[in-house]
Every structure is written in structure tokens, then in C-alpha cells.
Amino acid sequence: MNQELLEILRKEVKPALGCTGPIGVCFGAAQAYDAIGGEIKRIVAKIDWGMASKIDDVAFPGTEMLGVEMAIALGAVCGDPKAGLEVLHNVTPEGEQKARKVAELVEVHPMWERKDMNIYICLLY
């Protein structure tokens, strides 16, 4: 039984850089931007309330950024989509400034979902 539990943990537990709810939003934004690319004009993120409801209280590693809009912008601008939940491993001060500018100048719109979505983050660019 202990071996079976260890196998499940090895398969399911992944390293994360930061709190997993907000980092999940960053990861979703990085994945979406990687798939679409180009100039960011608008980002709409449909986010499961239960996953990231306290996101405004959590700072992102290596930055002074807080909040869902910043999570979306930071993931889209600086996120490494191949890094999984360590998506922000390469954020620089310059990248942080670029993300702040995107959050300020571009329509970054979070939509909170309170029903069972069967997915946790849905981004539209």
C-alpha cells in the first residue's frame, strides 16, 4: 500500500514556483500566448473561483506584482509555457515592467466562474 501511494505521489505531484492557484493562471496565459503569439490586444480569462479566489493576496516569485490581472499579463509576457508550474522561472525586472505595461494598456479581463467548469482556466486572446 505504501508503495502504491508513493507511485501516485510521484505521478501527480509537480514542482511549482509560487502558490499553485495564481501560478496556474500564469501558466494558462503563457500556454495561450505561446499558441497564438503576436501583439496582445485583449485577454479574457475565465477562471474557476475555487482555484484562484485569493489571487489578489499573493505575490508572484521574483516580483512585487499582485492580482489576477497581473497574473494574466505576467504569464502572457514572461511565462515559459514549457516549464509547467515553474512558468515564472525566468522573469526579469524588465519582463515585470513589460507585464505591468500590458496590464495597464491592454484590456485584461478576468471572468470568475462559480460553477463546475471541468477546466480551471480558459483564456481568449
For every predicted segment, state its role:
Residues 1-22, 39-42, 47-58:
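N-terminal alpha-helical transmembrane segments of multi-pass membrane transport
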Residues 14, 89-102:
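C-terminal catalytic/substrate-binding lobe primarily of soluble NAD(P)-dependent oxidoreductases
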Residues 17-22, 61-67, 89:
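Active-site nucleophile and cofactor-binding loops and adjacent substrate-binding regions
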Residues 22-38:
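Alpha-helical support elements that line or immediately flank enzyme active sites
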Residues 42-84, 96-107:
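A structural-propensity feature for long, helix-poor, extended segments
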Residues 107-114:
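Active-site loops and adjacent core secondary-structure elements that bind or stabilize anionic groups
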Residues 118-120:
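C-terminal binding/interaction regions
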Residues 125:
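Conserved small/polar residues in nucleotide/adenosyl-binding loops
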